[in-house]
């Protein structure tokens, strides 16, 4: 018996990476009886029946599980947002950050196309970078053209399972191609356009990039907050957690409650006002959704 990780699932076969070799495996019938489906990203115990084939005996406990794309044990999300073309969207980034935080996945913010910045836009992006770093997020500025920031990104990918997410046209494929030129991913191959991945129906595969595994489909192709409860939302804004302990009321939603330490921190300029505005907008969105039964 050996241990490995599923890197591809296709036509009833599971391709397991183990010590640098890939085995084409079938799942045992017991999984069907238990209604358990092995997922890409699963850590498994398998029995090799030849140099290249085998069958899966056990599926390890999952750290997390994404539905779209169907993948397990994602350790980090590379959130790619371009500095320009399309313009940087802090609100969309905050939406992704909430979703990532809710899945207990470590976010890494990558700002691409920094080579295209000029004076005023350079200052604006620098302010955003400063704000998100101050909150505690890992932010990398990159350019697929000048190769700036690529070594730093490669270091983050090493030894981890990552998904890539972000707007359409931000350069996700270009960045992965720059890290591993033989991939030859076409622009648009990894695509999330405000929630609709171009190929969410095709198989998911983990690609070996920079010593780590990266999903070749967009992470979080559904951008709604359907799986998040309203009282959980403040926890997914790390700076709110820090100040929230000073609120008068336990379970403060930081909207209209008296003596709210978070709102006081916003007024004092200690929390970026745009982050708070996005939070208020998300609260309103969640209040409007239909109840789940």
Swiss-Prot record:
NCBIfam families linked to this entry: ribosome small subunit-dependent GTPase A
Protein name: Small ribosomal subunit biogenesis GTPase RsgA
Subunit note: Monomer. Associates with 30S ribosomal subunit, binds 16S rRNA.
Biological role stated in the UniProt entry: One of several proteins that assist in the late maturation steps of the functional core of the 30S ribosomal subunit. Helps release RbfA from mature subunits. May play a role in the assembly of ribosomal proteins into the subunit. Circularly permuted GTPase that catalyzes slow GTP hydrolysis, GTPase activity is stimulated by the 30S ribosomal subunit.
Taxonomic source organism: Geobacillus kaustophilus (strain HTA426)
Lineage, broadest ranks: Bacteria, Bacillati, Bacillota, Bacilli, Bacillales
Organism domain of life: Bacteria
Positions that bind Zn(2+): 247, 252, 254, 260
Keywords, comma-separated and alphabetical: Cytoplasm, GTP-binding, Hydrolase, Metal-binding, Nucleotide-binding, Ribosome biogenesis, RNA-binding, rRNA-binding, Zinc
CDD domains: S1_YloQ_GTPase, YjeQ_EngC
Cofactor details (free text): Binds 1 zinc ion per subunit.
EC number per UniProt: 3.6.1.-
Leading EC class: hydrolase
Residue span, CP-type G domain: 63-223
Residue sites binding GTP per the record: 112-115, 166-174
Record has Nucleotide-binding as a keyword: yes
Entry's Gene Ontology BP terms: ribosomal small subunit biogenesis
Family, similarity comment: Belongs to the TRAFAC class YlqF/YawG GTPase family. RsgA subfamily.
Entry cofactors: Zn(2+)
SUPFAM superfamilies noted in UniProt: Nucleic acid-binding proteins, P-loop containing nucleoside triphosphate hydrolases
Pfam families: RsgA_GTPase (PF03193), RsgA_N (PF16745)
Listed GO MF terms: GTP binding; GTPase activity; metal ion binding; rRNA binding
Annotated Gene Ontology cellular component terms: cytoplasm
Localization per Swiss-Prot or TrEMBL: Cytoplasm
